[in-house]
């Protein structure tokens, strides 16, 4: 009996140690494995290049930093983005997009919307609030809350929600301020949880850019990496019209060519392709056609090319 009791005690201790290890070491291990920086740093830039860089207002249209379990205010050796490194890089504007769902086996070619979700486990290991367990909308709101907390605790980061606020940040930088404008965006509008009223709620939380799709088809329409290759649904059309009426920037970086064309035909506002490449230069599924890129540019749109 004593031996059995000792065995059960040992099993309990080992189980508790495993749980403790998962919750303490798991978040860093996950980001190290999944948020990798590829390649080496290359040659150091010339003095002229550094001087030019320092003279510019540098903007990055895409970063998933809020997904990970670490403070943006502390320098990290994981990933690429935190406030100390943004200051080093003379960043003026940083778009911070929130990831709320990622299909298992995610790839550029074809993903099922019914595939198991990677973010559910990530959120569990990173101890996200219970409300985020089954709601993509709550996952977006949680990450937005994190950004607002970081900004409140920093003299170098401000959450910007209007063109006037952005102008003020850029003006302050002319006076040697190092203030960084942080903007909120969604990585796919499945974060609406199928409810158009959530557009207003996300807007009130500070979101000023919404991408329509990510790596899978959703209620708004087809993804560039989904299975249907369809255009906007009726729900998608309603969502796009509402976003546009509120002044929300619409990002089509992961949308099917049919969705991109539908959006161009539906509204007159400029679009954003926040992170992409040119299909004529790199012919793969990740990049939309040069013809669509030209239509977006002719409309006054903004295209962010990965490097």
Residue ranges and their predicted role:
Residues 280:
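Active-site environment of non-heme Fe oxygenases that use a 2-His-1-carboxylate facial triad
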Residues 1, 84-86, 233-234, 270, ...:
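A signal for specific C-terminal beta-sheet/loop modules enriched in small/flexible residues
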Residues 61-65, 252, 276:
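Generic detector of well-ordered alpha-helical packing
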Residues 2-227, 283-306:
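N-terminal hydrophobic targeting/anchoring segments and the immediately downstream early-domain regions
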